[in-house]
Amino acid sequence: MFLKDYKKTALILKDQKIDYTHLINQVNSFSTLLPNNNLSKVAIFSENRFEWVYAFYSVWMKKAVAVPIDFMSSAEDVSFILNDCKPEVIFYSNGTKEICEKAIAQLNHKIDKINLDEIKIEESKVNATFPEANPNETAVIIYTSGTTGSPKGVMLSYDNLLVNIEAVTTDVNVYKEEDKVMVLLPLHHIFPLMGTMVIPLSVGGTIVFSPSMASEDIMATLQHGITIIIGVPRLYNLIRKGIRDKINKSGIA
């Protein structure tokens, strides 16, 4: 439903390219790390990377609910989220390991940990398919930043996501199979999650990761032939500032 084998490149980061066949095989392999029984929710606490995508879709393959967490969250906020939604498993990275461990230490319930940087499994080449999801079932829980108090979880159903997909692929043909979409904003936000991952991959497009929000990384990523950039005013201000700072340092202006 959300991921098909389009026989083309699905993910790009610098000179690394992952095709849809490899993507689906990796998702299936990641799903084998998750328990078969008593799995309702899985948290993802990591910076943007290929493994973030594998982890996310592996949760859906298990018919569980994905809970993305801001990789810059404090241990207190992570602990609050984990205690609030009580996922059975959390994916994390070396970059978030310290915060993750501090957060888990504050919990009164058990949670299994999977480090994305330590996963060593043979790629599964089983012809795996995603199970049909009930449109009314919860697909993902998105937590607010907690700027006005503790983070609050928003439950979105598969139907919520499908309505968004259809709005920009069928009703208005914004996303097409030939598009290359830049992944720049953190994927724990619903806007980039849908706009730079779920929607482009659902139509067979290619998503291209920028290593950072630095202007030089963005410019290098654009060389891959980007056709869609998803951003917010603050992001564009950062890009503008980076460019102006470079110009000022060069003495051109």
Where are these regions (language model features)?
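AMP-dependent adenylate-forming
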Residues: M1-I18, T148
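Conserved AMP-binding/adenylate-forming
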Residues: Q16, S31-S73
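Short hydrophobic alpha-helices that are characteristic scaffold elements of the AMP-binding
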Residues: F56-A64, D84, V198-S202, R240
